[in-house]
Amino acid sequence: MTLIPAGRGWQSLVLLKDIADSRREIWLLRGAFAGLVALGVAALVALCWLFAGRAIRPIEESQRRQAEFIAAASHELRSPLAVIRTAASALAVDPAQAPRLRRSIENECARMARLVDDLLSLARSDAGTWSVADAPVDVDALLLETAEKFLPLARERGLSLHLEVPDTDLPMVRGDAQRLGQILTVLLDNALSYTPAGGAVTLGAQALPEAVLLRVADTGPGIPSADAAHIFDRFYRADTARNSKEHFGLGLSIAQELTRLHHGTLRVASTGPEGTVFELKLPVPKEPLS
């Protein structure tokens, strides 16, 4: 209400306005604001769910692999324990069989010790605490030493073991000579174990522009292509001739981890009925080592 002059007096003027449209606009703005808030909250929840899922996925995968690893390890440990228990029971019943049963128990204990060592190595690798030395390694000496170590075993199994290296010295690499020897030991042990008598295993090497390529080839039954894709998986063993009580399916996994620690690559280069070839490539430092 407003007062306005009118002659000698005053008059009141009242202005009326319909605010229904304004109220409608206010409610529309409130609704739009509430919708935007709800949409923002929904988007925030979706983003949190997405990022949380991505963050949790590696943890879930790690837990799944750990559960599978423990289950497989338990299964592998159960086998030698069963043999030891059976041998111990038989020893109580028939003492005359003591020498044979004692050897059986000793062999199974040795198997368990190897398995535990392998499990500890992989556990250190998973924890990121597995380290290797960083020193110059004479590849020629490493190959010769490894071949000489396996030559008696090859002869015992009726196999030929060949060492093929170039006439000139191979370049030296940096790493842990003991661990590199362990990789070659795994490859040669597999090759000698799965190659039938009369076959041949070859340990070879060649120099590449920036690397040294080591090769282990055998004339065994080969690895089916379906199995080759999983050959480095832990506890994986093909259901073919490449299966042995002496092997737990961990050797190649350990060799792969050691290769990674040396910044190299390990792969199955060739498989088939004519045999299998594993190739280990190690980088050569740009500056020559002495």
Which role fits each region the language model picked out?
Residues 153-164:
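Short conserved segments within the C-terminal catalytic ATPase subdomain
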Residues 191-192:
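Short helix-loop "hinge" at the ATP-lid/N-box region of the Bergerat-fold HATPase_c
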Residues 263-265:
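Conserved glycine-rich
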Residues 1-31:
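Extracytoplasmic
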Residues 223-235:
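Short conserved segment of the HATPase_c
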Residues 127-132, 172-175:
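Conserved micro-motifs of the catalytic ATP-binding
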Residues 107-115:
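Short alpha-helical segment of the dimerization/phosphotransfer core of two-component systems
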